[in-house]
Swiss-Prot record:
PROSITE patterns: HELICASE_ATP_BIND_1, HELICASE_CTER
Binding-site residues for ATP, renumbered to this chain: D176, E177, V178, G179, L180, G181, K182, T183
Protein family: Belongs to the SNF2/RAD54 helicase family. RapA subfamily.
InterPro entries reported for this sequence: Helicase_ATP-bd (IPR014001), Helicase_C-like (IPR001650), Helicase_RapA (IPR023949), P-loop_NTPase (IPR027417), RapA_C (IPR022737), SNF2-like_sf (IPR038718), SNF2/RAD54-like_C (IPR049730), SNF2_N (IPR000330)
Record keywords, A-Z: Activator, ATP-binding, DNA-binding, Helicase, Hydrolase, Nucleotide-binding, Transcription, Transcription regulation
Function: Transcription regulator that activates transcription by stimulating RNA polymerase (RNAP) recycling in case of stress conditions such as supercoiled DNA or high salt concentrations. Probably acts by releasing the RNAP, when it is trapped or immobilized on tightly supercoiled DNA. Does not activate transcription on linear DNA. Probably not involved in DNA repair.
GO process terms (BP): regulation of DNA-templated transcription
Motif (DEAH box): 278-281
Oligomer and partners: Interacts with the RNAP. Has a higher affinity for the core RNAP than for the holoenzyme. Its ATPase activity is stimulated by binding to RNAP.
Domain Helicase ATP-binding span(s) in chain numbering: 163-332
Annotated HAMAP family: Helicase_RapA
Protein name: RNA polymerase-associated protein RapA
Stretches assigned to the Helicase C-terminal domain: 491-643
Length: 968
């Protein structure tokens, strides 16, 4: 290369150094000073990775003194270029030697880099374009936020997340029956809200025992890094902020922490966007005396825009506590308990009409009359005629049914705030089989009971019943050695024999008391050496996690896990199918929660429920009430809570006494009332609620689209190429997985989210679901998103020169491919991306300035191109400059016209969608007070903001590829 002192060059490998000046040429070496950083670099003259910087007529350059020059001509003297042109400030004719150019110039615009000879590899241009296309596709997907989580594609879960996650500040009660996946639904909604920018700060309140489980679940399933806050963490955070809750965006804490006034005040002041409360059925409320826990959540719900309440046990027919939870979501709507009860009485007519619409038969007259009355403000006659007509296309009829059903759901009841799926409406559950195992009452227990009754003392009926149900506890009160009961209790003998005969099976054992669980573990270990682990409230969260993992381990793990009652809240063990109830809880909801640890979606086997009980005792009588009265062992019993409240006193008397006639009467009355409630629930609100909650065919359609996206091999190829270009080390591991590791030759110094020791990933959902240690890669995964950001946020692939070998075209024919980005700067929360996301615009110009992009698609054109090296590419660009300058101007004209059209389309789409939604909600507000004014105001403001942002839309040249035809 010919070098001369004072010439300006730029480093091909360190463009951030700015414009360099040749300060020494000696022998075979050249030294370049980069004044912007004050650094020197010495290069071999023959192989220096440097590009000579020269400008052309029409360019504007800046002097080191700060004034600019518009170049009209240039001359060369002693190897240095002298620019002649117009001074930007004085308008005079001036000259500027290249030595005096501003050294802070960086060539980050694609055309500047192209003319400076900073030309990228051909494959990098392709990857950059693919990255921009992937980002655009993701931003425009109405399934954004549903594809990425590592969860099964279960229709009702995806439907609820799709419906709720798209709302501004959703306020809903997720009340699916046990085992239907409320935590996953909440995680999907959180993931959607964060990914779409509708929320940035999230507070999750959970029972103390579930904090770590939520932390792991959010990270493992949703790639969301929450922080667990307790008192110690709050104290530590003071070093960073006066309010500890401001130190993290995503926080999990317990209600216990927020019972403290200081912590609650800080949480109230922390500007959360979304509040999530798990196990919300523990929030007790009466109008006269709401609990402290309820007051804490109520205070937060008044200042946080979005609220999700998760509860496994909402009352079915208008219980006060259920009303109280709805009141948290919308106190204006649910202001009076009596008014709420009165409204529920009208659900029957709505349910009948909804059930008729959900079927396939013609509508009976009663249903038509109900619909006409319920939707009186709307002309439904055309839809009714379509449904009732013969010979009409079934899809058209189904669309008419769906439209009326949606109108019904929108206008009546709690359809927008309450989602409740039952097992009756969701397929895929195993059967439950009840196996009672009667045992003889030990003499020791009979003696302890006699002594206790002789000693007298005043006890409540409930305390007496609890004592009768746990004779081992009563016995321990009279024994110094609390563990001795298990040496004679026949239930323990049965349990040991059962475990020995089922050695290959995992068995979950649940007892009411932690002391009982510990004693059982000791009995199994000391008497037979059976591997079992314990799970109780006295253990730390980490100890509980270890116990759960030890039980889950296939090789060398525990055969049995023995839980106290807390083991039946929040922990799931679908890999086991045998459940031993060592005793029975006095609450039907607790019994269902126990069984629900195994009876969940994902359970592959039928569930065997075993109950060793002592004959002719309170245990047997309670078992009979559950089994014969409620059928609670083999079926879920949604009315259990109501039935227990009605029959509690009679049941307690039966448990404490020994009157066979009383028991028979209780069972008969319970069975009769159970049937009444079951019939009432089928006739009432539940049908309508379930139709709305499981989504029907619409939910199936969402799942089908997600499954198709999972099979997208084009995406897999694009992501693999992305990692190849960045330089990520990829090692195949088995049929469906890859190990990713950082490499020494990566294009970027770090790859956020990629651990130093690597990570195992898969594109196959089933593989990821079966292996906790393998990440599921989709477009939404942080490793993909980060990779896209690394490429599109850098200069990678912004310039390229290629050769087209085609003898049908004259040699030397030039094409200029320009990739523009149409964009508008706006906060993510504005939702502008739904209408005008960053959109790639491809322009392919021939030498005459004609745009050929509509005739020549990217993929077929790209396949015909061959790469050229950087230096040859630089020479080709220099030789083609006179042609290129007018082509850039022409390309911008075409791109601007495309942007203008995109903005028109975006504005029309936005106006149509938001005006339609606003009109719908305003008309609904007249008949359904469940529509919040905040939602309407948000839509009005959003339309104004979006119009402003669209007015400021911009066009930016993102990448250039110059192509020359060659016959060689």
């Amino acid at each position: 290369m010919p070098f001369a002192l004072g010439q300006r060059w730029i480093s091909d490998t360190e463009s951030e150094l700015g414009l360099g000046t040749v300060v020494q040429v000696e022998g075979r070496m050249v030294t370049v000073l980069f004044p912007a950083t004050g650094e020197n670099r010495m290069f071999s003259r023959a192989e220096a990775p440097l590009t000579r910087v020269t400008y052309n007529p029409g360019d504007t350059v800046e002097s080191h003194e700060g004034w600019s020059l518009t170049i009209e001509d240039l001359t060369e003297k002693d190897g240095l270029v002298i620019y002649h042109g117009i001074h930007s400030e004085t308008g005079e004719q001036v000259t500027l030697r290249e030595t005096l150019l501003n050294h802070n110039i960086r060539f980050n615009k694609p055309q500047d880099r192209l003319f400076a000879g900073q030309i990228d590899r051909l494959d990098r241009f392709g990857v950059r374009y693919q990255c921009q296309m992937l980002r655009h596709k993701l931003a425009t997907s109405d399934l954004l936020g549903l594809q990425g989580p590592r969860v099964g594609l279960i229709p009702h879960q995806m439907w609820i997340a799709h419906e709720v996650g798209r709302r501004y500040a959703p306020r809903v009660l997720l009340a699916d029956e046990v085992g239907l996946g409320k935590t996953i639904e909440a995680g999907l909604i959180i993931h959607q809200q964060l990914l779409t920018g509708r929320a940035e700060r999230v507070l999750v309140i959970v029972p103390d025992t579930l904090r770590h489980q939520w932390l792991v679940e959010m990270l493992r399933r949703f790639n969301l890094r929450f922080s667990v806050f307790d008192e110690d963490r709050c104290v530590e955070a003071y070093a960073d902020h006066d309010n500890p809750f401001y130190t993290e965006q995503l926080v999990i804490c317990s209600l216990e922490l927020l019972r403290k006034k200081k912590r609650l005040d800080q949480a109230l002041d922390a500007d959360w966007d979304l509040l999530v409360v798990d196990e919300a059925h523990h929030l007790e409320w009466t109008e006269e005396a709401p609990s402290r826990a309820y007051q804490v959540v109520e205070a937060l719900s008044e200042v946080v825009p979005g609220v999700l309440l998760l509860t496994a046990t909402p009352d079915q027919l208008g219980h006060e506590s259920h009303f109280a939870r709805l009141r948290l979501l919308d106190p204006d709507r649910f202001y009076d308990y009596d008014a709420f009860l009165a409204e529920e009485n009208s659900y029957k007519d709505v349910a009948i009409a909804a059930e008729a619409l959900a079927g396939n038969a013609k509508l009976p007259d009663a249903a038509i009359n109900s619909l006409t009355e319920l939707l009186s403000e709307k002309d439904i006659a055309p839809s009714i005629r379509l449904i009732q007509a013969d010979g009409i296309d079934s899809d058209v009829q189904q669309a008419a049914r769906s439209e009326l059903l949606q109108e019904l759901l929108d206008r009546h009841g709690t359809g927008r705030v309450l989602y409740r799926n039952s097992r009756a409406s969701v397929k895929g559950f195993p059967k439950r089989f009840f196996n009672p195992h009667p045992q003889t009452m030990p003499e020791q227990y009979l003696t302890a009971a006699r002594v206790s009754s002789m000693m007298g003392g005043h006890k409540t009926l409930e305390a007496k019943a609890a004592q009768a149900l746990s004779p081992e506890k009563l016995y321990q009160e009279f024994e110094d050695n609390s563990a001795s009961w298990w040496k004679f209790d026949p239930r323990v003998d049965w349990l040991i024999a059962f475990l020995k005969s089922h050695r290959s099976k995992k068995v979950l054992i649940i007892a009411s008391q932690a002391e009982t669980a510990l004693s059982l573990e000791e009995a199994l270990r000391t008497r037979e050496g059976i591997q079992a682990t314990v799970f109780h409230e006295g253990m730390s969260i980490i100890e509980r996690d270890k116990a759960g993992a030890y039980f889950a381990q296939e090789e060398g793990g525990a055969q049995a896990l023995i839980c106290s009652e807390i083991g039946s809240e929040g922990r799931n063990f679908q890999f086991a199918s045998h459940l031993v109830l060592f005793d029975l809880p006095l609450n039907p909801d607790l019994l269902e929660q126990r069984i629900g640890r195994l009876d969940r979606i994902g359970q592959k086997n039928d569930i065997q429920i075993h109950l060793p009980y002592l004959e002719d005792t309170a245990q047997e009588r309670l078992m009979q009430w559950y089994h014969q009265g409620l059928n609670a062992f083999e079926l879920t019993c949604p009315s259990g809570h109501v039935l227990y409240a009605e029959f509690a006193e009679d049941l307690l008397n039966v448990l404490v006494g020994d009157d066979a006639d009383e028991l028979t009467n209780l069972l008969n009355h319970t069975q009769s009332r159970y049937k009444e409630l079951k019939h009432a629930m089928e006739q009432g609100r539940d049908k309508l609620l379930e139709i709305n909650s499981h989504g029907g065919d619409r939910a199936k359609a969402i799942v089908e689209r997600l499954a198709q996206n999972d099979e997208n091999t084009q995406l897999i190829g694009s992501v693999i190429r992305l990692w190849d270009i960045i330089g990520v080390d990829q090692e195949d591991k088995g049929e469906n997985s890859i190990i990713l590791r950082p490499s020494e030759h990566m294009m970027f110094p770090t790859y956020p989210g990629l651990p130093e020791d690597g990570v195992t990933v898969t594109f196959d959902r089933d593989t990821a679901l079966s292996r906790d240690d393998i990440a599921l890669i989709t477009q939404e995964h942080p490793l993909v998103q980060t990779g896209l950001d690394l490429i599109t946020g850098s200069e990678t692939g912004t310039t390229s020169v290629a050769v087209l070998k085609n003898k049908a075209l004259p040699a030397g024919t030039l094409f200029l491919e320009l990739i523009y980005m149409a964009d508008a700067s706006a906060p993510k929360s504005s939702q502008l991306y739904r209408y005008l996301p960053p959109t790639p615009i491809r322009i392919l110009l021939d030498k005459n300035g004609n745009d050929l992009s509509a005739k020549v698609d990217y993929a077929s054109f790209d396949k015909q191109l061959s790469a050229v090296n950087r230096h040859i590419g630089g020479k080709l660009v220099t030789a083609s400059q006179p042609i290129l300058h007018p082509l850039f101007a022409k390309g911008e004209e075409y791109a601007q016209a495309a942007v203008d059209e995109l903005v028109i389309q975006a504005r029309e789409k936005m106006t149509t969608q938001l005006t339609g939604e606003l009109d719908r909600l305003e008309s609904l507000k007249a008949v359904n007070p469940n529509i919040r004014e905040e939602e309407l105001e948000y839509l009005r403001n959003q339309m104004q903001e979006l119009n402003t942002y669209l007015d400021a839309s911009q066009l930016q040249l993102d990448a250039i590829r110059m192509v020359l035809v060659s016959h060689v």
